[in-house]
From Swiss-Prot:
Coiled coil: none annotated. InterPro entries: ArsR-like_HTH, WH-like_DNA-bd_sf, WH_DNA-bd_dom, WH_DNA-bd_sf. This is Uncharacterized protein MJ0432. SUPFAM superfamilies: Winged helix' DNA-binding domain. CDD domains: HTH_ARSR.
């Protein structure tokens, strides 16, 4: 699947997989990305239905909240499974 060709998108899904949701700035800091770069990758993930973003007011400030969808969870889990299966065939 083409969406997994980007290391950044794989990292985003990996971080979100273990969380109920997170704020935009949390992802930006964890992945050391610019606003524009993160927005670009989130847009691609949203177009595939792998993540959802919404604006929420938290402590009087508007925050962008990101969460992985069920479709995104299944796709990421399958991607990791495929990687693990491939790694079993590697001889050192």
């Amino acid at each position: 699947m083409k969406i997994f060709n980007s290391v950044v998108r794989v990292k985003i899904l990996a971080l979100l997989y273990g969380l109920e949701y997170c704020e935009f700035n949390y992802l930006k800091e964890k992945l050391n990305l610019t606003d524009g770069n993160l927005e670009h990758h989130l847009k691609k993930l949203e177009e595939c239905g792998f993540v959802e973003t919404k604006k929420s007011v938290i402590k009087g400030r508007v925050k962008t909240i990101i969460k992985i969808t069920n479709k995104g969870r299944v796709a990421f889990k399958n991607y990791i499974y495929e990687i693990l299966q491939l790694s079993k065939n590697i001889e050192c």
